[in-house]
Amino acid sequence: MKNTLGRLLASILGAAAAAPAFCQEAIPEHPALRDRFYFAAGMFFPRTTTSAELESRSGVGANIDFENTLGMKESKDVPMAMARWRSGNRWRFEAEYFQMNRSGDKTVDRTINWGEQTFPVNSTVSSKFDFSDLRLSAGYSFFRTKDKEVGVGIGAHVAAYNATLSGTFNGAPIGNQTEKVTAPLPVLSFYSQFALTDRWAVAGRMDRFALKYDKFSGNLTGIGLDVMYQPFKNVGFGLGSRALALKMSAEDEGRKAEFKQTFQGPVLYVNASF
């Protein structure tokens, strides 16, 4: 009996000693939260709305809807890429990039004023609108465990615009005008990442910016959501969503340029981490 009780007590003590190790092993460890380097490349499938205004030096200008007025497509599949580097246990540095170039041709039913160019009713207007966004961020995870992290970051969305309008009227060329604007928009970011299992994880991020200074004003809101599946040690897959809304206005050489744009759609990518 004593031997039986001794064996039972030894078993209980052994199980109690093994319990913390078992619980520790049960905590999921996903590569997205563990690996120091993370790279991804894939496709972004956004729907977009675009409006812009470029005043002449005399102050004449009108807001133009590039999709409805100038015949640009509302959606286009574009490549995207992102990278992350973890420095220590709590710091992380990220970059994400996409570029969307579009063009359109349409006979307009109203007068279009774009900078110093005027396109009268029934003229054929050819438009080109190129946009790129480079997101840079340095984040600090104030809450960090093996399977969870929540943090804040500072960074910038470097938004670059290149818009050109040209046209003809009754077969005769009217002229063209191009406006280029590149603006690094500083943002405050909030992010989180959670491992569901050793292979599945979810992540979320929100960027926010608002500034009015001298002859510049702008605001930006960006949201990113991701579901990540990594069946291999160094290779995985991701499905997510991106939403970006921005508005900026700047005055230069007596002319005011204003851009307002939204992007929203799914992303699909392959990632490598180590």
Residue ranges of model-derived segments:
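Repeated loop/turn-to-beta-strand initiation elements of outer-membrane beta-barrel proteins
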Residues: 90-93, 146-148, 198-202, 234-237
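Cleavable N-terminal export/targeting peptides
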Residues: 1-34
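Outer-membrane beta-barrel transmembrane domain signature
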Residues: 157-233, 244-247, 274
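Short glycine/proline- and aromatic-enriched beta-strand/turn motifs that initiate or cap beta-hairpins
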Residues: 23-100, 267-273
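Early exported N-terminus immediately downstream of N-terminal targeting peptides
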Residues: 97, 148-159
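Residues on the lipid-exposed face of transmembrane beta-strands in outer-membrane beta-barrel proteins
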Residues: 41-43, 81-85, 95, 136-140, ...
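Extracellular/periplasm-exposed beta-strand and loop segments of Gram-negative cell-envelope proteins
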Residues: 49-77, 99-132, 159-183, 211-215, ...
